[in-house]
């Protein structure tokens, strides 16, 4: 089992699919990348995200992937719905809120605060290739298209 304190200067990389123990709050708050894959297993994946002020993750859908998101710091508005152009479910979230997104649900998360929004996301099954690291949203969009 790998035990990583991800201290002051963490070595952020994909530690999957070995057992792994770490301080998730610290790792999430230390992450400065738009998306960092920290652990990829056979049936689940953990990513850390940092959304800049006034930024968003972008409207997206995962047809075959359930998603759990927890906000560690910041303020956001969550949008979800069955149609890309009609995200009728909306909620304000901040630190310690959890968001559950069923497979096949369109969604977006918008940072409405003045500080970066720090969150982590669990995908089941994995959504991104092993070791995915996107420094910016633009990097993520380039890779996905």
Model feature map: region roles:
Residues 83-103:
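Short acidic-glycine-tyrosine-enriched beta hairpin
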Residues 68, 115-131:
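A short hydrophobic beta-strand segment most commonly corresponding to one strand
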Residues 34, 38-44, 54-71, 86-87:
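A short beta-loop-beta micro-motif enriched in histidine and acidic residues
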Residues 1-45, 58, 91, 135-145:
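A short, N-terminal "cap"/entry segment at the start of jelly-roll beta-barrel domains
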Residues 50-52, 63-78, 82, 122:
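Short, conserved beta-strand element in jelly-roll/cupin
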Residues 37, 46-50, 68, 90, ...:
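Conserved hydrophobic/aromatic beta-strand scaffold that supports enzyme active sites
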Residues 57-59, 78-79, 101, 107-113:
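Short beta-strand His + acidic residue motifs that chelate non-heme Fe in jelly-roll/DSBH
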Residues 44, 53, 64, 75, ...:
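A generic "binding-loop/recognition-motif" signal
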């Amino acid at each position: 089992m790998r035990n990583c304190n991800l201290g002051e200067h963490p070595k952020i990389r994909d530690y999957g699919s070995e057992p792994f123990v770490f301080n998730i709050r610290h790792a999430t708050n230390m992450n400065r990348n738009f998306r960092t894959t920290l652990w990829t297993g056979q049936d689940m994946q953990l990513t850390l995200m940092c959304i800049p002020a006034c930024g968003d993750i972008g409207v997206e859908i995962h047809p075959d992937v359930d998603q759990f998101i927890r906000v560690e710091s910041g303020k956001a508005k969550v949008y979800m719905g069955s149609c890309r152009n009609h995200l009728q479910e909306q909620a304000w979230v901040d630190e310690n809120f959890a968001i559950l997104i069923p497979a096949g649900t369109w969604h977006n998360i918008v940072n409405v605060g003045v500080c970066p929004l720090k969150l982590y996301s669990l995908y089941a099954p994995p959504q991104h290739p092993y070791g995915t690291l996107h420094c910016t949203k633009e990097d993520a969009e380039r890779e996905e298209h």
